[in-house]
Amino acid sequence: VIPGSESRVDAVDGGTVQLTINSDLQWYMQQMIAEEAQAQGAKGGTVTVVEVGTGKIRAAAEWPTMDPNDLDASSPETWTSKLFTYPFEPGSTFKAVTAAAVMENAGVTMTSPTVSASSHEKFENGAVINDAFVHPTFQYTLAGALIDSSNVALSKFGTMVSPDVRHDYLERFGVGETTVGFPSETSGAVSYTHLRAHETGRNL
């Protein structure tokens, strides 16, 4: 380019990007998680709304967060998304993995057999499992265990399949893998050597 002259390059249209986020729902979730986290005295909180039939993320809110137009007003810790870059424990959603494994490999149905489970039990390897509420010993069907979200009962159902089967189902359900391809997204970790029949999801 000769000094003092101009060089013109016509713009090229970019691609089309369409978010799955519902803006109204996103705004509401953002307000809700901020209010609830502060009301509970929590250091932070996240909430994700996923459309079950498609897997589309309709809202992904967290607190504390930052204003991209005013980074100086926020802590560097808020400059990334904890929703995608921090690993988290699957919790009671993990019970679906256990249920699928025993139904397809151990002949378990929603109504038979039953397992005897109290709200607090110690397993053979020393692990102690508790339910969220205190209750006497119940004879749980798989359906009942899922309805009550019983950690103890689901752990007992989980002993009906081998560690190899459990590990296979973890992989088939995508546990320990990235999801949406977000920059720096973590995949989490699933250790086969530490896989135990009574894990309910809190220890992964």
Q: How should each PLM-predicted stretch be described?
A:
Residues 2-5, 21, 51-92, 97-202:
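Beta-lactam-recognizing serine transpeptidase/beta-lactamase-like catalytic domain environment
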